[in-house]
Design a protein with these regions (language model features):
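A conserved beta-strand element that flanks and buttresses the S-adenosyl-L-methionine
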Residues: 49
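Class I (Rossmann-like) S-adenosyl-L-methionine-dependent methyltransferase catalytic domain
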Residues: 1-37, 57-64, 68, 76-128
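Conserved sequence/active-site signature of Rossmann-fold short-chain dehydrogenase/reductase
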Residues: 53
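Glycine-rich S-adenosyl-L-methionine
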Residues: 73
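Local beta-strand N-terminus motif with an aromatic residue
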Residues: 45-46
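Carboxylate-rich, divalent-cation-coordinating active-site regions
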Residues: 40
């Protein structure tokens, strides 16, 4: 909000704690919910960002959540998720994870993105 003072920012989180402790500048536009049923109209946002959250969803929520991100975005999207490329990184992720539910390789994430028709940018985070 400080970088783009004329912007309209909204957020959704599954954590009541995160909503209650959100930044004062946007707190009134944060809602409790899950990405598989976003309350905004089609093409509502100029930019949709999901950072380190999709891997916290159960596998059965991934497809709908990715489709919802696609639906509410006019064009620009970015997401970042946890992933692993080998057994060591998978073990590191398993030991680290507290809320991670979707453990996917890069190829598996790409499969989910393609299945959902997700055409935005993304990055994968690894525990080396």
């Amino acid at each position: 909000k400080k970088c783009l003072p004329k912007s309209e920012i909204h957020g959704i989180d599954i954590s009541k704690y995160a909503i209650e402790n959100g930044k004062d500048e946007i707190k009134d536009r944060l809602i409790l919910g899950i990405a598989n049923n976003l309350p905004w109209e089609d093409n509502y946002f100029d930019l949709v960002i999901s950072i380190m959250s999709l891997h916290c969803l159960h596998t059965y929520d991934l497809l709908k959540s990715l489709k919802e991100m696609q639906r509410v975005s006019k064009n620009n999207k970015y997401l970042c998720v946890e992933s692993y490329r080998n057994e060591k990184e998978k073990a590191n992720l398993l030991y680290w994870q507290v809320t991670c539910e979707a453990f996917n390789t890069p190829e598996e994430w790409e499969w989910w993105f393609n299945l959902a028709g997700y055409n935005g940018d993304y990055s994968l985070n690894y525990f080396e």
